[in-house]
């Protein structure tokens, strides 16, 4: 059986007295698209940076494809990364930006040029090789950043809120393009986002984080329909909360009996979470 594309065991990280990551355990299968979802300050970006080697964990292990990379510097880890700010080199052409990693690996010029052409075609920017970042829109710059991240055919693609700086219409279009491209290439992808709609529409699985810990890992449907904690129920989607008393096979809200599964005992006071679409 092949090892997971990425495996984290007991990963912890603190900045002084502030604990950013609390005992993170997670496995990501090859070809999966996983979203780290949570509010600002929950630890999702720190976790991505630890995976990339841009931050060093205080404890725990990180393995990629069965290889322990816990102590390796970023340059020795097998990933491409796209930042929210694009991080393109303004003095380099589009072609040179995309080829940057290939040049560092001493890829022959002809092979690098062919790869650049292939990737720009793939991200919808054919013929843009000679342009410079300042001549491109935000959406086009993000496409160039994505092409650069994919140039070396990495085993892992890391995306740090790549769409959040774009306007709403471009964001929705790029969301679908990015997901289609990921499926076509089959590259294992981890994306950080605080946008629920983004995570629910793009991810194979969602990792919901809060205060440095993982609250739930599941498919979009599992996270939405079967939240593991009150935080997940409140954070993902909209929900109505009602005071209820448990009864056999359901709960009573005021004078109304609601049939629902529960693991409590009759007579217990609980909070009933109801999605708006379930109200008739």
What is each residue range found by the language model?
Residues 60-68:
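Conserved ABC transporter NBD signature motif
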Residues 52:
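Helix-to-loop junction immediately C-terminal to a conserved catalytic motif
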Residues 33, 74-80, 84-231:
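ABC ATPase nucleotide-binding domains
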Residues 37-39:
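The feature captures the beta-strand-to-loop junction immediately N-terminal to the Walker
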Residues 45-48, 144:
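ABC ATPase nucleotide-binding domain helices that frame the ATP-binding cleft
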Residues 253-280:
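Glycine/charge-rich catalytic "coupling/switch" loops of P-loop NTPases
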